[in-house]
Amino acid sequence: MTDTVDRTESSGSGGSGLDSFFKLHERGTSVGTEVRAGFTTFLVMAYIIFVNPSILSVAGLDGAAVAAGTALVAGLLCVLMGVVANYPIAMAAGLGINGAVAFGLVLNDGLTPAGAMGVIVLEGLVVLALVAVGLREAIMNAVPLALKRAIGVGIGLFILFIGFVDGGLIGHGDPDGPVPVDFIFPNSMGAWLTLTGLLITVILFARKVPGALVISILLTAAIGLIIGFTTFPDPFVVTPSFATLGEFDLGNVFSQLGFVAAALTIFSFMLTDFFDTIGTATGIAEQAELAEEDGTIPGVGRLLFVDSLGAVAGGAAGVSSNTSYIESAAGVAEGGRSGLTAVVVGVLFLIAIFFTPLAQIVPLQATAPVLILVGFLMAHLIMGIDFGDFEEGFPALLTIMLMPLTFKITVGIGAGFVMWVLIKVVKGKAREVHPLMWVVALAFLIYFGQAVLNQAISA
């Protein structure tokens, strides 16, 4: 793939401790590049500091405490990911899961906020157990190479789609029309800011300017301040509150929901966490050229271990499940190749604990152009998929398309896995299917049929 920097650049740190620990020279990167990549990733995902509280406060949680807790947990997990796994993957509270916690578990199912966080802790413990016995890594290694590449492409299109949505260029279509989304003609200040940012991003990237992505974000954010789209917060320094730490309850989950309903709920959250991370890790490793030729990821066990702590830590801190972020691809596009990138992101999150209001001066319209470009960069993996082979091409296509169309990574992965197994069976090649692929396909059938199961339980 094409990077914004020359990856043959000298590490500039020779035999230093950082170079040796993070294998910078071996991976064709440098301290400066990693720091720049870390800043880029942080800027692209800093929105979670104010978005997570806005969602969880609906469920009755204290917004200021959630903001501080979000930055704290994300910071610690990012540092841990960098030091333990040495991958340029950042972690923070997962969007989607936090919405399911607030609107699903609390407002719909009637759990207390502490009880909802208890569900997150329980599903995190299940995932942690699966990592401990090696099942999560074994499943990753059992996935066919074509589907691994399809996952990377699908995540790229998902990121690109997020960029268009965040930038205000794509939105809800005519409710009476044939499609649920539509192009929004730039008739707002936000949309024009996105287009301006995209122009800046394209020019800087095409000219191979070092730091193109982080420069683009900062310039676009500055333009937003100048034209009055955003305002400088007052105050911008706050005394953090950590009132949500330890606010989780494991005791009443099964009694309030019933055993079967609680088990299905935990299973659903677990499956989402489990395969979202597999998808993100696969896509980022491929983009960073850290995966082997057969698609396996060296040292993935350590990566999965740290990620599996995210749900437990997020639930225990009362800020919802933390997971590996697909926005890490922005830092990789900036040249990040090691865990030092993640450490930089973590340090910035920890600093942000005292400056949480400042996150709002970098609007989504400033980061949307970078996401659009990153989506393009990840699309190159599609060249490794043989669409002339129906067995390989059709499941791959489902995986690629359903991620952005459903706005869910797990749905795309599940559809591709189930279709892969189905086609092998109908062609008399069932013996070619890895045993774990059978298990995963069955799990996804249960996942897709969960609505029917819930109706049967409530009937």
Where are these regions (language model features)?
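Helix-loop-helix junctions within the multi-pass membrane cores of secondary transporters/permeases
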Residues: 16-52, 73, 94-103, 107-152, ...
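Helix-loop-helix hairpins and the membrane-proximal interhelical loops
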Residues: 2-65, 179-183, 215-301, 444-446, ...
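Membrane-embedded alpha-helical modules
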Residues: 109-226, 230, 343-459
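Residue-level signature of catalytic and energy-coupling elements of molecular machines
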Residues: 35, 55, 139, 211, ...
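Membrane-interface helix caps of multi-pass small-molecule transporters
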Residues: 54, 79, 83, 104, ...
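Hydrophobic/aromatic residues within the transmembrane alpha-helices of Major Facilitator Superfamily
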Residues: 39-46, 76-79, 83, 160, ...
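Juxtamembrane transmembrane-helix boundary signature
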Residues: 74-95, 126
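Loop-to-helix transition at the N-terminal end of transmembrane alpha-helices
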Residues: 60-79
